[in-house]
Amino acid sequence: MTRNPNKKPNPEIHIFHNGEVAEFDYFGDFAKFLSDNDARVIVRNYHKRTKGKAPWQLIDEAVRQRISKKDGDQVWCVFDIDDYLKDAREKFENGLKKAKQHGIKLAWSNQCFELWLMLHFNQVSTSVSRQDYEKKLQNLFKEIDVDYHKNSLQLFHKLLPLQPKAMQRAEKIFQKDQPQENPSTSLFLLIEELNNFLNQ
C-alpha cells in the first residue's frame, strides 16, 4: 500500500513516570485500549530511567529527551507529591518552572497515585496517608470482586466503568497550580487528553 505523503501523522503523547509499577502499568493498559479502539494517537510510556526519581529529576529527564512538540505531540510527567514539596520546596518549585518553560505538562497527585484510584469509588476531601489508602482500596476493590494490592495488574480495565465518576470527583478537588493542596490531583487532565482521541 502506498503511504500518503500528505497524511498528517498521529500525534504522540510521551508520559514519564517516577512510580515503581502501578502508574506505568495503568498507562500502558490505557495506551493499548486506545490502540484497540483505533484512536489516532501514539502513547509512549517512559519508566526504566525515571522510576524512583524526585519530581524535578523526572522533569529534567523529560527535558533531556529533547522531544519535539510538532504535530500536536505532548510531553507529560506523572508523579506523586509525597513529602517532596515539604522537604525540598525550592527544588520542587524550580522543577515546576522548568516544566512550564519547556512546555511539559504535569499530572501530579497529592499525596499519591492511590488518590486517583480511590476517586473511582468515593469523593476524597480530607488528607489520607499512603498506608490508609492501601487499606481503604483493598476494601473498596472487594466490592467489585477484585483482589487489590499496590502492583495489581490491569487496574485501568477494572476501573474503566468507574472512570467518569473519578473525573468528576478529581475536578472537584483540583486547584490549578496548587500541588500543595492535599488531597488534590491533576491526573484527570491527562486522562481527559487521552480520552479526547477516542472521539476523533
Which residues make up each language-model segment?
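C-terminal accessory helical subdomains adjacent to catalytic cores in phosphodiester-
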Residues: 2-14, 24, 28-47, 63-200
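Phosphate/oxyanion-binding active-site loops and adjacent basic polyanion-contact surfaces
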Residues: 19-23, 51-59, 182-186
